[in-house]
Amino acid sequence: MQQYRGFKDAHPECVLFFRMGDFYEMFDEDARTVSKAIGLTLTQRGNGIDMAGVPHHAAEGYMRRMVEQGFRVAVCEQLQDPAEAKGVVERGITRIVTPGTLVDESLLTDNQTNLLCAMRCNDKIIHIAVAEISTGLFELHRVAVDRLDDALERLGIAEVIVGEDEETIISVIEHHGISLTKRPAWHFDATEGAALLKKQFGVTTLSGFGIDDDDPIVGVAGAILEYIGVTQASTDAFVHLRTPSLQESSDFVSLDATTIRSLEIEQTIRGNSSEGSLLWVMQRCKTAMGKRLLRRWLCEPLAQRRAIEQRQAIVEVFADDATLRSTIQQSLDQVQDIARIAGRVATGRVTPRDVVALGTSLFGCDEIANELTGDALKSISEELTSLATKLKPLAEMITSRCIESPPTHMRDGGLFVDGFDAELDEARSLQRDAGQWLSNYQAQIVEETNIGTLKVGYNRVFGYYIEVSRAQADRVPDNFTRKQTLKNAERYITPELKTFEDRVLSAESMALTREQQLFKELCSSISECIHNIVAFADMIARLDTLACFADVAMLYGYVRPSIVDEPILEIQDGRHPVLDRLLQDRFVPNDCVLNESPLALITGPNMAGKSTYIRQVAIITLLAHTGSFVPAKSATIGLVDRIFTRVGANDELHAGQSTFMVEMVETANILNNATRNSLVILDEIGRGTSTLDGLSLAWAIAESLSGVGCRTLFATHYHELTALADRDSNITNLHVTVREWNDEIVFLYRIAQGRTDRSYGIHVAKIAGVPKNVVDRANEVLNTLTVHNAQASDEATSHIPAEPQMGLFTEYLPSPLVEELKQIDINALSPMEAFELLREFNRRASGEDEH
């Protein structure tokens, strides 16, 4: 217990998994913690110490469950064979398992990244280093303080390392529920960071990475390297990390957290399900690496036309050649997750199955490279061919030395084939010959003793033995030594059998020891090639994702969009990719043109497709910037710098923000940051306040965005806004068409030019199941109000002054009768009182009393 407490005192923030033989044991408070967290049985030792344990072969699953609940696990292993220990077995911490440092296959999800992040704020800029230990990813980012939420949403961070004094960052991280690791400020020192980076990448200056030695981001990068070394208990744990790349924000279209959620890129708003998301539609990658890259590309669209068109050219080759696409995808389907295998090699967590999977995957490199022909694929083909040449010796080494169906763990032995290592062959020969020797020996002693029922056997507890029935026991010779007494038999050992047993058991140990040594040497050879393996993994991921784009395009009828520098948007027969897949041939496509009039006001009934329309335009624009083809008959997309959305508030009541407050905060972000090159979609601004306030805000917001000149789709239920198109050439009106027939309406889901002045809300209420008497009464009230409010509404909007004089806006708002009507409690009125009140309103609205 003294040894245990020493390790526990050194890592008080962790639950300590303490290896004792075939189990990991937890004691005292740790035992109570795991018992409560994951339901392990709590027991006590003789001295009253609480304890709990898990079998070593199942420990990874328990560790994962602990980490998922926010705990950190320190793993303390036996560093020597207990049989050779003269006192307490030597032990040591071999790794610390945290949310951002997972490397074992059982702890990770194939299609999701697991990013570790370090942050430091300097002059209102947050410097960020991002690493993924399991794949070797290493990137540097800079974001403004007010854009931290967006960065967290876009990157999908599992754990953040931050200085203890970074209150602003800490509060944001805690709000997101991300695992937080606080470190003293000196861990982020730029001088120490520069030294670590130079040592890691073998350079004398960091200028080749686009950063200076004293840049604050260097300290952040150093902090993440130091943390990886601590958690993996090795300075070799980050040998596979790529050289740090500084990500320039101008290279990517900016998507804030609201946009990623609103467009349902990764998961749906309702249910938080991946099924029904954009990623769900686009996911036809064959490799785990491709699946992770696809998610990254969808959240980080390209902003440079040349980079987009380079991707498009490759997608087009695959789209036009079904045979090539099929061949490549079949080859990719055989490639294992070599990026994460490389990570496990670097961290010492690699298994025999990993090694064999790596060898098989590397052999496919040649085949894939040979299939890639043509100008568009030339650079990928050349790079893959170069990597194949470099990695071929390693692939041959692995496949020639290892069996095709390897054991799960090296402790089981049996990984290597016969014939390539003489020492291993000799040990195995002794094991194989054991069966024949035992058979011969049994025949010999049966003949010598004349005991026909005598048998030679083996079990793990007693080893080898000679078994004789009780009835024949008095006939055994003197050189038989009794070893075990059974109910109906006696078991013996002889000097010859004991000598044989020692030789066989020694051979088993020799074979396993030799295999473990050979495995270590093989892993060392893999480590020498690790940077080429990581480069190969990157190329495979890119190729897989581009082939995936082509596969989706051909499967669902997507086209290559034209990318232009001018701020225009022309989409013919555009479709929402998710609904198009779900509804198949029943989805109604629509055009969108935002050129001379970049702001379109869209009116029409509820449930008629306004929200779907504006979302599909945003998603088509996003897909075009990833290099993918798009769901349309044709499309010309002008480059955008940002995509903004305001398409339905999610209440943030826990943060003290109402639905309307969230709506206004998100709208403020758009108004303060949108540029002429942005795309903005707005859905029903102003619903969370009074009619007059909402209309006023919507009007002013539309005018402001018109002034910016950004491409905007503004869906609204305020029909008064359509008057803006009469006075502002930047604004045009669109509406969703319906067909009226026998007092019923049919939604056509078609977008057409012009305005509409009806919302058909009562019809929507009817089909939603509102009782008939309520629907009938609503129609009566609507007919009365429509007649008397139409003139007042038209007059009010016609008198609204241009934007510079908006201080006079409220003098010309629609009739105050609307506000008075909203204050009436209908249930408190008798029929006669209601009639009299309606007649009074009628008289006033008609101008008999006041105009």
List each model region and its residues.
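Charged catalytic and DNA/RNA-contacting regions of genome-maintenance
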Residues: 1-317, 330-333, 337-346, 350-443
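Short flexible coil/turn linkers enriched for glycine and charged/polar residues
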Residues: 10-12, 67-69, 110-111, 122-125, ...
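ATPase nucleotide-binding head domains, primarily ABC-like/P-loop NTPase cores
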Residues: 28-31, 214, 286, 297, ...
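Active-site phosphate-binding and catalytic loops of NTP-dependent enzymes
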Residues: 76, 99-108, 235, 376-380, ...
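Conserved catalytic alpha/beta cores of large enzymes that bind or transform nucleotide phosphates
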Residues: 157-163, 497-529, 629-632, 636
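Amphipathic heptad-repeat alpha-helical coiled-coil/stalk segments that mediate oligomerization
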Residues: 188-196, 203, 253-259, 265, ...
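Charged, surface-exposed helical/loop "interaction arms" that form contiguous linear patches used
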Residues: 347, 351, 364, 379, ...
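C-terminal tails and terminal domains of large nucleic-acid-associated
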Residues: 814-851
